Amino acid sequence: MSLPETKSDDILLDAWDFQGRPADRSKTGGWASAAMILCIEAVERLTTLGIGVNLVTYLTGTMHLGNATAANTVTNFLGTSFMLCLLGGFIADTFLGRYLTIAIFAAIQATGVSILTLSTIIPGLRPPRCNPTTSSHCEQASGIQLTVLYLALYLTALGTGGVKASVSGFGSDQFDETEPKERSKMTYFFNRFFFCINVGSLLAVTVLVYVQDDVGRKWGYGICAFAIVLALSVFLAGTNRYRFKKLIGSPMTQVAAVIVAAWRNRKLELPADPSYLYDVDDIIAAEGSMKGKQKLPHTEQFRSLDKAAIRDQEAGVTSNVFNKWTLSTLTDVEEVKQIVRMLPIWATCILFWTVHAQLTTLSVAQSETLDRSIGSFEIPPASMAVFYVGGLLLTTAVYDRVAIRLCKKLFNYPHGLRPLQRIGLGLFFGSMAMAVAALVELKRLRTAHAHGPTVKTLPLGFYLLIPQYLIVGIGEALIYTGQLDFFLRECPKGMKGMSTGLLLSTLALGFFFSSVLVTIVEKFTGKAHPWIADDLNKGRLYNFYWLVAVLVALNFLIFLVFSKWYVYKEKRLAEVGIELDDEPSIPMGH
């Protein structure tokens, strides 16, 4: 679409309104549009966390699944939600745009939650209640009942992936970075975006969990379905006020193109002088411009990828013909190399989210056996997650007000701890949390054995579990912001969208690894002496926690080696005399 030339300050040349005309600053975008988008994010967080954090009690108490099976169902659901964000981001950047992606996937999410609600209403979609006289022989959910449940959960996960991948980016599209006033408003937008995430989280682990446990699952899930439909209606009502940006394509396409081109040219010989490789200068000479690309110097690492930039004259490739699947610029190759350099750091972040997964599964099962009463009020098991959220918020507040100033004063570094330092601390706290959880479980188990199998609620207060929730919250505040900062800073300018994908994929893989670990442990410990028993009082859950603690500790040591090896992009380029262009960050919640 060609844009008419104009000198009006109110007309934006890089954004359109819903009718395809250049966007008018006075009629589109700004806070009115952003507020409607924030509604979607708050409800998405409320729904995903509200279902996930309390799902294990539904699976064990209503569907009569074992603890290990229930834990894997929850972690697979949450892992899929995060992994599908990659698909949602690809679809939004390449095909549909962010607006349509949000609208379509929010409708899919609403469908999934509606089916989940119906499964709690229709008696035939859940097994009968246990007979008090034969409680050890509860009838498990049938294949059809589980099929409906999984359909509901994974439709919800699919919808979550599309919404989560697009909502922060579409919100930022409502502000013009080239205009100082709107640029400052964008910063406040991301603050409010994070606020909405936390509001949704707190409502999920308190009000929504209480409704599910004390009023009824049909009401708890029904509220989620209604909230999604309401938020989607508000979102669609703002259509004529939104600003729309052109499709930018997925950065994964560039990665794939470089790999394919390098493979096609694998038999060609690299020139001794890298200046003979195809680069942005050749495109500038042929086409007159190469917007958005800052030429990067050649590096000696991963030289096999350099073959993507070899001109193959026999294949008909010249400087005037640019097919990215047969010939990539050296700058494109160097950007992909930078992604490859980040992969060891990326990989060592995964295990922290395996620790986090325990809070929504086995820790909830632990809390069911403890005395959770405060006076006449009993805290729902899943509401223990409020201490995790509290640890996260407290750490964020202290870090902003104390740690940043302290680092500036002691180390002359104005941004607080460096990204890799925060990631390392987060991993340390993750291992510590699992060690604490193992010690707490030992105490809980000794008390259970002392009082015999007939005592369902042990004479131990819920406060015993607070440390493990709190420590994970502290660790997550550090590692999440550290990962986000690291990926945003280190991703090449032309591939900033990869930062979101790299972050969310560690969450997804962490949840999936938890499922794999539980399955392996269940297989090797058997039914005679299980670590994760259906009745925790007959298991050895503390051994599983020790296993996770040791794995995360070893992972932490590996991370220290990789972080010592890693050189920040800014320093590496400064050593060859290149100053980075100003690269705006893309904050994002999770």
UniProtKB/Swiss-Prot annotation:
Note: When mutated confers resistance to the herbicide chlorate.
Name used for this protein in its record: Protein NRT1/ PTR FAMILY 6.3
Post-translational modification as stated in the protein's UniProt record: Acts as a high-affinity nitrate transporter when phosphorylated and as a low-affinity transporter when dephosphorylated. Forms homodimer when unphosphorylated and monomer when phosphorylated. Low nitrogen concentration in the medium stimulates phosphorylation. Phosphorylation also regulates the nitrate signaling.
One example of a Gene Ontology biological process annotation: oligopeptide transport
Molecular-function annotations in GO: nitrate transmembrane transporter activity; symporter activity
Result, substituting residue 101 to D: Loss of low-affinity nitrate transport
InterPro entries in the cross-refs: MFS_trans_sf (IPR036259), POT_fam (IPR000109), PTR2_symporter_CS (IPR018456)
Protein family: Belongs to the major facilitator superfamily. Proton-dependent oligopeptide transporter (POT/PTR) (TC 2.A.17) family.
The species this protein was found in: Arabidopsis thaliana (Mouse-ear cress)
Record's keyword annotation contains Amino-acid biosynthesis: no
Assigned keywords, A-Z: Auxin signaling pathway, Herbicide resistance, Membrane, Nitrate assimilation, Phosphoprotein, Symport, Transmembrane, Transmembrane helix, Transport
Entry-annotated residues carrying Phosphothreonine: 101
TM ranges: 46-66, 77-97, 102-122, 143-163, 193-213, 219-239, 342-362, 374-394, 423-443, 460-480, 501-521, 542-562
